Amino acid sequence: MVHFTAEEKAAITSLWGKMNVEEAGGEALGRLLVVYPWTQRFFDNFGNLSSPSAILGNLKVKAHGKKVLTSFGDAIKNMDNLKTTFAKLSELHCDKLHVDPENFRLLGNVMVIILATHFGKEFTPEVQAAWQKLVSAVAIALGHKYH
């Protein structure tokens, strides 16, 4: 289990409160699909993913990205119990979707980049470290069923 300090929790929740989940979620998933094109195989029913502009403009990518980032909201509400929070999603991604758990880590790293671009100077080294810790812990929780 990962322990978050009061300062880390404050850094995470402060930024999260300012986040446009719909915009950032679509951008994060879209960038994942562009930068790591092999991840597109999990989204073959999303239509046109033939180019970066097609991916970033794809309404299904944006909608699913919002859904993914909304689940990060659950992580923020339950930072002290991520394994339980993501148990069902871990099972779904492992047993039904067969998603390589490495993809969770990649998406987390993309999310940190999105945060940095959206929040600029507010995204201090301390804030970055707290978010990196969170996305890493979420990736581990999502990959739990694989072990």
From Swiss-Prot:
Domain Globin: 3-147
InterPro entries to which the protein is assigned, alphabetical: Globin, Globin-like_sf, Globin/Proto, Hemoglobin_b, Hemoglobin_oxygen_transport
Family recorded in the similarity comment: Belongs to the globin family.
UniProt keyword annotation of Nucleus present: no
Expressed in which tissues: Red blood cells.
Source organism (scientific name): Pithecia irrorata (Gray monk saki)
Keyword tags: Heme, Iron, Metal-binding, Oxygen transport, Phosphoprotein, Transport
Signal peptide region: none
Assembly behavior: Heterotetramer of two alpha chains and two epsilon chains in early embryonic hemoglobin Gower-2; two zeta chains and two epsilon chains in early embryonic hemoglobin Gower-1.
An example Gene Ontology CC term for this record: haptoglobin-hemoglobin complex
Record's protein name: Hemoglobin subunit epsilon
Binding residues annotated for heme b, in chain numbering: 64, 93
Pfam families on file: Globin (PF00042)
Single GO term (MF): organic acid binding
Function: The epsilon chain is a beta-type chain of early mammalian embryonic hemoglobin.
GO BP of this protein: hydrogen peroxide catabolic process
Modified positions (Phosphoserine) in chain numbering: 14, 51
